[in-house]
């Protein structure tokens, strides 16, 4: 069970809505993933009507919506997008995204912290997408963010946990949930993140661009479940030396 702010989730896998070939395929994949929290970009949704091709199927599926501010380049733009989303969707939950460079899509740490502090004061439940910077993540926690979402690698890159060393520090020091977001390319990456101690992962591109998104979503669901179970089981310590699983000489002595 995962708790963030006032909500609890059975699944530790969050999903996105971009890059799917159709809305029907998107919903089928989300259902196969078991995800209960789904993020969607405000720039891709018609907020004036709930029969939008992306929004309507999600509402019907009964998932918790997490609008994001993707496309915002400044704190001011992100705050404006957040206010529009709250008014249109009736939710104060928000994935805060500010990335001014369209090529790399790396989050702006200064603008993100500035916007996060303002949005928390306005009553938003803020989940900020940020770099894997332990100092920044701690500052975001201190201003009241409900979780932090450090990247594993650049958005859509499928590179995996390239920031593993920093993620481990963030997980160790955080008192709010840590959701590894961006760069997760295959199910084993998700398993690794959960084994490390992350509370959840957010996956979009890896599922949406697969030849069979529904099958890939199922694979991610199982991978996340495996990661959670492995962490709860408490793995053995890593050792430099070999350690025999059975006696090496005792049986020979018994036969002598």
Swiss-Prot record:
It holds the Pfam family ThiG. Its EC number is 2.8.1.10. One of its GO terms (cellular component) is cytoplasm. It comes from the Bacteria. 1-deoxy-D-xylulose 5-phosphate binds at residues 156, 182-183, 204-205. The keyword Lipid metabolism does not apply. The active site is at 95 (schiff-base intermediate with dxp). Homotetramer. Forms heterodimers with either ThiH or ThiS. Belongs to the ThiG family. This is Thiazole synthase. The gene is thiG.
